[in-house]
Every structure is written in structure tokens, then in C-alpha cells.
């Protein structure tokens, strides 16, 4: 009887604790999602989420001396004639998704390098691109795309330029999409998965790599501006123990003082504010000593910025990685489902980036220079 009573007490305690946990998790009224979270490893846990990256970057000077449309008074700018740039409202299949990724705006900044700087481009929403109605525009179609009812084809007012194009869909692509995209062959794809997917449905396609590998055009910093800052993008120690062990073996780096950055942003930010935030991140990455990232959007730009970067992932993504995975220093699970370390280290124990990306970035620059 005594053992039964003890068991009942344990059950009651578990139920009470479960109820308390549910109440804590559901009480989210006072939780604020910052445009991006930046905090230092030495900060206490209670203060980490109170350090706002936007507030910190407002103090940062524009060292490049270049000013873009989103850094000027919008009312004083004229629209660029015939140029569009992609924005992102994360609207899929009739509903707005909860996720956000400032990396999308980094992709748009890469495209913006090939447009005039003294005017503002027309905004075209990636996820409802077939419903764009405005002046005729040229639009670089780089980055991540999921084909659905809102973007099976481009609006008649858009002249799409398909380079660094990635398709998220696993299923067979609709015929209406295939018939439309064939008008603009050959299609430059960001990865081999997208290239092969298009070719298997009769579309001429080639691997062009990612457009963010051209970001040195506007965002490359001088070497004497480089800091000792180590940045973790959407990664922290404890997320992937095998990778942690490798990072701690890099004795040339001090991992006791790390800047953590989250690529999610507050969806309430205007598109101009999102561009501002993306540029400030690039300015920061261009001056870092080392970047550890679980985001392709945070890794590939570093190749162009000449900032040493290690891409970490727990699981090989067969849709996104083929082709671009080989351009990076990587620590994680490879295509054979085995843990692998592929990182370039010099005689001083410092990380340096592979240079294979250059053969593709040079072609992209030449292709888009006279857009």
C-alpha cells in the first residue's frame, strides 16, 4: 500500500510540474522578437536577449563611403528606370509564414550591386511575383524560391534574369511554370539539385553558384579594418558536440568572447529597415576575424568578403548543398551521412577560405555587369 501511495504522489507532482511548464510556455505576451539578436558570451543569461543588434548598429559608421537607396530619404529619390529588386513577405499558399530570414535581403543586396546607386528600384514580392503590376522591370531571380500558386510564372511586366536560382520543391514542377521558365533559357542555378531538377523536365540549365559570392563589389573591407571579433551565426556551443570539439582544437582563436547573431528578424520591420539591417550585418561580417555559421546566407557572403568562415550542419541537405557545399570550409555530416571536417588551416593555425568560388563569381559579374 505504501508503495502505491508513493507512486500516486509522484504522479501528482509530475502533473503539477507539467501544468506549470505549460503556463510558462504559453505566456508569451511580453516576449519581443528583435530584428536580430546580438549578445556576448560573457553576458549573463538574463541579459543576453536584451542586447538589440539594431540599437548596436545604429552607432556604427558607414566606413565604405557608399550609400544606397535604403540609407537615404525615400521621398527625395526617384525610381530607377526598368529595375526591380526582390522583397519578402513570406506569403505562401494563401497564408503568411511565421519564419523570417535576413539572409533573403542579403541575397537582394547582392543583386542590387548591379543597379544604379542614385535611385530606388521597384519592389517585387518574391512569393507573389505573378501578381506584380507596375512599370516594366528587369529582375534578378537569385536565391530561394518555392513554386506555388503565387509564383508559377512571372508577371508580364517583369523581365526575369535567372542566375543563382534555387527551387525548394521536392515534387514535380507544374507545367505552367516549366512553359514559362523555358522562355528564359538557359537558367543559372545556385545548386546542382535545382539544375538537375530543371533539366529532368526539359529546361536548359547550368550551375552558376550563389550571387552572394560577388558581394566584394560593394562590401569588401580593407584588411586594416579587420577586428578580432569571432561571430557565431545561428549557432552556439552545445548545438553539435562533434563540431564543438573541433572548434576548441583551433588554438589560434579565443572562443571565450563570442558575438552571437540570429538571422531571424521582426516581421514588423519595413522593407527599407530590413535592407538597412542586412547591410549592417554585411559590414560587420566583412571585418570579423572568424565566422562560424549554420546559415548558407551567412557563410557564402564571407567568401567574397575574404572573411574566414566555417559552415556547420548536423545533416546534409541534398536539395540545397550540391555544388555550393564544395565551395566552403565545412564541419558536419557529408553526403555519405558521415561526420567530416573539411577546413583549410595555414601554418599559423588560422582558417582560410577555399578559392573555388572565384571561377563562378567572375562569370556572374561579367554576365550582370551590363544588365
How would you name each of these model-derived features?
Residues 1-17:
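N-terminal Sec-pathway targeting helices
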Residues 19, 23-371:
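Active-site anion-handling motifs in enzyme catalytic cores
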Amino acid at each position: 500500500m505504501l508503495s502505491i501511495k508513493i507512486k500516486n504522489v509522484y504522479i501528482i507532482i509530475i502533473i503539477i510540474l507539467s501544468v506549470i511548464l505549460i503556463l510558462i510556455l504559453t505566456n508569451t505576451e511580453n516576449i519581443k522578437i528583435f530584428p536580430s539578436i546580438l549578445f556576448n558570451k560573457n553576458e549573463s543569461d538574463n541579459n543576453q536577449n536584451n542586447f538589440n543588434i539594431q540599437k548596436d548598429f545604429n552607432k556604427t559608421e558607414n566606413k565604405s563611403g557608399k550609400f544606397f537607396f535604403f540609407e537615404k530619404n525615400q521621398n527625395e529619390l526617384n525610381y530607377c528606370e526598368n529595375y526591380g529588386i526582390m522583397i519578402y513577405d513570406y506569403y505562401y499558399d494563401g497564408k503568411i509564414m511565421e519564419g523570417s530570414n535576413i539572409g533573403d535581403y542579403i541575397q537582394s543586396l547582392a543583386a542590387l550591386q548591379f543597379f544604379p546607386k542614385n535611385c530606388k528600384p521597384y519592389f517585387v514580392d518574391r512569393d507573389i511575383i505573378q501578381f506584380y503590376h507596375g512599370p516594366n522591370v528587369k529582375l534578378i531571380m537569385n536565391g530561394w524560391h518555392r513554386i506555388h500558386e503565387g509564383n508559377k510564372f512571372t508577371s508580364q511586366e517583369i523581365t526575369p534574369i535567372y542566375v543563382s536560382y534555387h527551387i525548394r520543391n521536392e515534387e514535380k514542377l507544374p507545367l505552367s511554370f516549366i512553359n514559362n521558365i523555358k522562355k528564359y533559357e538557359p537558367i543559372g542555378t545556385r545548386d546542382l539539385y535545382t539544375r538537375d531538377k530543371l533539366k529532368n523536365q526539359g529546361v536548359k540549365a547550368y550551375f552558376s553558384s550563389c550571387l552572394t559570392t560577388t558581394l566584394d563589389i560593394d562590401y569588401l573591407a580593407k584588411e586594416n579594418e579587420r577586428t578580432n571579433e569571432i561571430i557565431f551565426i545561428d549557432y552556439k556551443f552545445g548545438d553539435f558536440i562533434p563540431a564543438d570539439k573541433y572548434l576548441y582544437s583551433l588554438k589560434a582563436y579565443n572562443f571565450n568572447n563570442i558575438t552571437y547573431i540570429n538571422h531571424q528578424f521582426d516581421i514588423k520591420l519595413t522593407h527599407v529597415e530590413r535592407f538597412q539591417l542586412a547591410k549592417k550585418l554585411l559590414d560587420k561580417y566583412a571585418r570579423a576575424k572568424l565566422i562560424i555559421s549554420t546559415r548558407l546566407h551567412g557563410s557564402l557572403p564571407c567568401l567574397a568578403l575574404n572573411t574566414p568562415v566555417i559552415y556547420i550542419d548536423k545533416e546534409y541537405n541534398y536539395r540545397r548543398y550540391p555544388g555550393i557545399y564544395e565551395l566552403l570550409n565545412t564541419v558536419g555530416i557529408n553526403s555519405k551521412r558521415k561526420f567530416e571536417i573539411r577546413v583549410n588551416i595555414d601554418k599559423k593555425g588560422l582558417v582560410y577560405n577555399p578559392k573555388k568560388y572565384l571561377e563562378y563569381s567572375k562569370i556572374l559579374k561579367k554576365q550582370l555587369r551590363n544588365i
